[in-house]
Amino acid sequence: MKAENVKLGIAPIGWTNDDLPEIGKENTFEQCVSEMALAGFTGSEVGSKYPRDIDVLKRKLDLRGIQICNAWFSTFFVDGKKEETIKGFIEHRDFLHAMGAKVIGCSEQSRSIQGQKKAIFKEKTIFTEAEWQLLAEGYNELAKLAAEKGMKVCLHHHMGTGIQTPAEIDKYMEITNDDVYLLFDSGHLYYSEGSQQVMLEVLEKYIHRVVHVHLKDVRDEVVAEVKANDLSFLEGVVKGTFTVPGDGVIDFKPIFDILEKYDYKGWMVVEAEQDPAIANPLEYAIKGRQYIREVAGV
């Protein structure tokens, strides 16, 4: 890949999991961002331990050569909470804009089971046609609000949500305007379908609307256990569903090839939540960074 086209970031979820605060609670913000820099990354998404004071956060990140490239935002359009979602989004947008980010990654969390003790493959929600229209109207409005600051809004397809499968991604892309984008997540798509080919087909199909990329690997043996025992999303995370690129079953070279073929410009972010007491965050960050260097050439 062309080094001038892509920047490499890593998410703090490998150090502390905001969905499971007891996982990695001993790891501080300063340790987290110091180790990101030490591993060779120049970008980060935002975790719960990050200072919200813009000047303080900038100073601590600048010291380490780290930029903020995105931060998760939960939307609830299907639940009928448009007004609250829009208000929160504007505050979130302004924070990210002040930090220099260009994209805003969102997840539609209406009836999401990703944080609940429900079987991830059997109990996920399915949106009705009317609910899809609520979502489309909401995301089309978010796109306009993002554009006011020269930013782009992108949806993070995610296990346990109403937008998880390729068919659901298709529906989302079909009913939203062209200025509503996609956050492509290798791990969540592979986890959902168990297919490298399907994952690559989705990426190539929508590459012109992909503005942010999460590089997440998957351990097939853990997914098999999750399916066999009707485990929840977070139960799978604790057991090791996810890991850094090069440590699981996904072959990332075709992903990098597609991104290069279509001249993708933006961030690639390693997002690999696992128990830091088992998978040392610095060790795994270095492992993921080395794999990307070897396979993508950046």
UniProtKB/Swiss-Prot annotation:
Keywords: Cobalt, Lyase, Manganese. One of its GO terms (biological process) is inositol catabolic process. It is an enzyme of class 4 (lyase). It catalyses: scyllo-inosose = 3D-3,5/4-trihydroxycyclohexane-1,2-dione + H2O. The keyword Manganese applies. It comes from the Bacteria. Pfam families: AP_endonuc_2. Disulfide bonds: none annotated. Its cofactor is glutathione; Co(2+); Mn(2+). Its EC number is 4.2.1.44. One of its GO terms (molecular function) is manganese ion binding. Signal peptide: none annotated. NCBIfam families: myo_inos_iolE. Belongs to the IolE/MocC family. This is Inosose dehydratase. It comes from Histophilus somni (strain 2336) (Haemophilus somnus). The gene is iolE.
